[in-house]
Amino acid sequence: MKYFVVALALVAAFACIAESKPAESEHELAEVEEENELADLEDAVWLEHLADLSDLEEARGFFGNTWKKIKGKADKIMLKKAVKIMVKKEGISKEEAQAKVDAMSKKQIRLYLLKHYGKKALQKASEKL
């Protein structure tokens, strides 16, 4: 769970970096205006904005790939946890539990884990009372 939280924090940091824009100065706008021979300052701002879009697209591509990797690892961890819980709870062999988990959809696995951990949290809360 700690690793998932750390990974989620890293993803959020990458998203913030991808969305951040450098401060626009008059000097930069003047250079853009001179390069493109633009008389209007609004056109220079628009062109600079277009130049920034390509950087954002690259960052979004990186963010999307990173998110897919994290999601894949989280799915693998959920599968392993579901197998461990079934072995312990139902008293069956690891191979049988693995076969049951393989037959379940990802949504069913998530629901199974939520039920298990929900009951566990409820038991701990009732013990404290």
Swiss-Prot record:
<keyword id="KW-0964">Secreted</keyword>
<dbReference type="GO" id="GO:0090729">
    <property type="term" value="F:toxin activity"/>
</dbReference>
<dbReference type="GO" id="GO:0051838">
    <property type="term" value="P:cytolysis by host of symbiont cells"/>
</dbReference>
<comment type="similarity">
    <text>Belongs to the cationic peptide 06 (cytoinsectotoxin) family.</text>
</comment>
<keyword id="KW-0204">Cytolysis</keyword>
<comment type="function">
    <text>Insecticidal, cytolytic and antimicrobial peptide. Has insecticidal activity against the flesh fly S.carnaria. Has antibacterial activity against the Gram-negative bacteria E.coli. Forms voltage-dependent, ion-permeable channels in membranes. At high concentration causes cell membrane lysis.</text>
</comment>
<dbReference type="GO" id="GO:0050830">
    <property type="term" value="P:defense response to Gram-positive bacterium"/>
</dbReference>
<dbReference type="GO" id="GO:0005576">
    <property type="term" value="C:extracellular region"/>
</dbReference>
<protein>
    <recommendedName>
        <fullName>M-zodatoxin-Lt8f</fullName>
    </recommendedName>
</protein>
<dbReference type="GO" id="GO:0050829">
    <property type="term" value="P:defense response to Gram-negative bacterium"/>
</dbReference>
<dbReference type="InterPro" id="IPR018802">
    <property type="entry name" value="Latarcin_precursor"/>
</dbReference>
<feature type="propeptide">
    <location>
        <begin position="21"/>
        <end position="60"/>
    </location>
</feature>
<keyword id="KW-0800">Toxin</keyword>
<keyword id="KW-0044">Antibiotic</keyword>
<keyword id="KW-0929">Antimicrobial</keyword>
<keyword id="KW-0732">Signal</keyword>
<dbReference type="Pfam" id="PF10279">
    <property type="entry name" value="Latarcin"/>
</dbReference>
<feature type="signal peptide">
    <location>
        <begin position="1"/>
        <end position="20"/>
    </location>
</feature>
<feature type="short sequence motif" description="Processing quadruplet motif">
    <location>
        <begin position="57"/>
        <end position="60"/>
    </location>
</feature>
<keyword id="KW-0354">Hemolysis</keyword>
